[in-house]
């Protein structure tokens, strides 16, 4: 008889946001007259920018003409998009990242789950705690995390780096040397960041110890402070120790369009083996390229009109973040984040657990957020609210919470 990958059986429960969706659906079915405001999952609400819509329309018209029709895309991405990314996201910031070091995909989530395939099954990972759950779950599926302790909600072969109020949500360098270090900056879920000199310490640590940093920069467009790096490649030596993940979902509203990319520098090697070559081989085998229409939309993100329109869109969401953070602070909540990231990380009141506060908000304010414990054990007693709602609903949700 056939056998299954037993590692999938090790995953506790369902994926965090799937669990939330089921709980909300059950409540809505039982209370159809209630208006629920969703500030949980980080899905955008504003429409695609006009420059992007124009690019989509033009590309669709091209697909309707035999002379300009495009079939399978190049598996690593169209050159026009890879060059636009290289010029605008990297060379403009002084980072020497060439177009052929950029691998276009259908989003950062799949890349963040798939990148672990480059590493051996006995590699140890280190994650900040709390952390985006995909990093750990994908390594569980690969059989890399050891055994699960339900009481502590930790894995025996995972190195946890607590990010709490006590350390300003800035983790310490791990004492046990990991093979892979996952860093998400600006951070999801805490909304905190590192300054360049702080990030340089991590790069130096990785190079010294032979570790690879998986750097998730999905929220870099929301950085407002000048001394916070947008890319890990702004640090000296990062090209020999870091892989960077990027998304078009949060900076350009592509959650329903799907586009992202991963940077794997040619200098990143394990002995004589190039991780760049490995990822190119993996990408070519398992991915058939993002659609032409979508990649043309991605190119429009870097047009003058696209940049201006998306700057306004980011400002819209960050105004939501400011509104939530200020309002909750006035109501007596302890709040973090919301400055360089579109997330508010708040302490749950009255010693409620994260899920108790989730239920309390849903039932009494009809507002959905994300329980902090879903991001790891150090997230217990915290709660995440997103600034990606529309402004009117954000204000309404805040009024409901303050009235409790």
Swiss-Prot record:
Pathway assigned to this chain's UniProt record: Amino-acid biosynthesis; L-lysine biosynthesis via DAP pathway; LL-2,6-diaminopimelate from (S)-tetrahydrodipicolinate (aminotransferase route): step 1/1
Residues with the N6-(pyridoxal phosphate)lysine modification: 250
Its EC number(s): 2.6.1.83
GO molecular function, one term: pyridoxal phosphate binding
Keywords: Aminotransferase, Pyridoxal phosphate, Transferase
Residues engaged in binding pyridoxal 5'-phosphate: 72, 108-109, 132, 188, 219, 247-249, 258, 288
Reported cofactor(s): pyridoxal 5'-phosphate
Binding site for substrate: 15, 42, 109, 132, 188, 288, 384
Top class in the EC scheme: transferase
Cross-referenced Pfam families: Aminotran_1_2
The keyword Oxidoreductase is annotated on this UniProt entry: no
Protein's GO biological process: lysine biosynthetic process via diaminopimelate, diaminopimelate-aminotransferase pathway
Catalytic activity: (2S,6S)-2,6-diaminopimelate + 2-oxoglutarate = (S)-2,3,4,5-tetrahydrodipicolinate + L-glutamate + H2O + H(+)
Biological function: Involved in the synthesis of meso-diaminopimelate (m-DAP or DL-DAP), required for both lysine and peptidoglycan biosynthesis. Catalyzes the direct conversion of tetrahydrodipicolinate to LL-diaminopimelate.
Similarity comment text for this entry: Belongs to the class-I pyridoxal-phosphate-dependent aminotransferase family. LL-diaminopimelate aminotransferase subfamily.
Known partners and oligomeric status: Homodimer.
HAMAP family xref list: DapL_aminotrans_1
Name the record gives this protein: LL-diaminopimelate aminotransferase
Organism per entry: Agathobacter rectalis (strain ATCC 33656 / DSM 3377 / JCM 17463 / KCTC 5835 / VPI 0990)
């Amino acid at each position: 008889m056939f056998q299954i990958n037993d590692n999938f059986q090790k995953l506790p429960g369902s994926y965090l946001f799937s669990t939330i969706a089921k709980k909300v659906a059950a409540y809505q079915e039982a209370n159809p007259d209630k208006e629920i405001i969703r500030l949980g999952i980080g899905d955008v609400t504003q429409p695609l920018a006009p420059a992007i819509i124009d690019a989509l329309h033009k590309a669709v018209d091209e697909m309707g003409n035999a002379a300009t029709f495009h079939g399978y895309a190049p598996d690593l991405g169209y050159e026009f998009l890879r060059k636009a990314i290289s010029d605008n996201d990297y060379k403009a910031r002084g980072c020497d990242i060439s177009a052929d070091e950029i691998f276009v995909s259908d989003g950062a989530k799949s890349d963040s789950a798939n990148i672990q395939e480059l590493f051996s099954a006995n590699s140890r990972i280190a994650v900040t705690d709390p952390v985006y759950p995909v990093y750990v779950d994908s390594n569980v599926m690969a059989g890399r995390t050891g055994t699960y302790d339900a009481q502590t909600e930790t894995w025996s072969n995972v190195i946890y780096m607590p990010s709490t109020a006590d350390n300003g949500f800035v983790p310490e360098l791990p004492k046990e040397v990991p093979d892979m270090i996952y860093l998400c900056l600006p951070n999801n879920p805490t909304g905190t960041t590192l300054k360049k000199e702080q990030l340089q310490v991590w790069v130096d640590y990785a190079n010294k110890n032979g570790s690879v940093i998986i750097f998730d920069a999905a929220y870099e467009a929301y950085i407002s402070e000048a001394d916070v790096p947008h890319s890990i490649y702004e640090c000296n030596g990062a090209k020999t120790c870091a892989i960077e993940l990027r998304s078009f979902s949060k900076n350009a509203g592509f959650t329903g369009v799907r586009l992202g990319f991963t940077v794997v520098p040619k200098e990143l090697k394990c002995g004589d083996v190039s991780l760049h070559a490995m990822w190119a081989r993996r990408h070519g085998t398992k991915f058939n390229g993002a659609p032409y229409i979508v990649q043309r939309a991605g190119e429009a993100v870097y047009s003058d009109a696209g940049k201006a329109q998306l700057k306004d869109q980011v400002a819209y969401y960050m105004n939501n973040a400011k509104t939530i953070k200020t309002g909750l602070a006035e109501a007596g909540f302890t709040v973090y984040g919301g400055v360089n990231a579109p997330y508010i990380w708040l302490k749950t009141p009255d010693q409620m657990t994260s899920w108790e506060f989730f239920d309390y908000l849903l039932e009494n304010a009809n507002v959905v957020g994300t329980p902090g414990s879903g991001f790891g054990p150090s997230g217990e007693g915290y709660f995440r609210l997103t600034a990606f709602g529309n402004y009117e609903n954000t204000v309404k949700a805040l009024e409901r919470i303050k009235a409790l």
